[in-house]
Amino acid sequence: SGPAEDHAARLVETKAVIEEAMRLYPPVASMSRQAVGPDDLAGKRIRKGSLVVVSQWVLHRHRLLWEKPDCFDPRRFLPGSREKIDRFAYLPFGAGPRVCIGASFSLQEAAIVLAHIMRSFSLELKKNHVAMPVQHITLRPEGGLPMILRRRGNRFTAPGAAAGVHPSG
């Protein structure tokens, strides 16, 4: 493993921030599956061949599954807390045989990229901009997300440290 992989393994808090962002704003807001046989789901009869839609948007904000579900709290995904999350309560990359094969890679890549950005810049949402999520193929902010980037003075800060996201270890 090279330096990038070693840093990625230590970016626990950065990954927690990304995962919490994906909980509130899942890349794909819903997924569908076809029932391979008859079943009962929450007291409703599902016939073979029926299309069942699971909304990650609703699932990730469900009050029975998440404490303060509308609050951004990356601590949910830190070691010690993450293990308490029901395995079917958090599905940003889907689940089962059709789970996104790039899930692990994309999370690692996002953590490395975010750490490098935060090491060099501070980011601020443009004043008075309200981010409105819209579903296309993926969930995204309508009209983009206009940000103000400011170069940080100390270019040698540890990845993520200036943003309050510190590598563990």
Model-predicted regions and their roles:
Residues 14, 20-23, 30, 143-169:
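C-terminal domain-closing interface element
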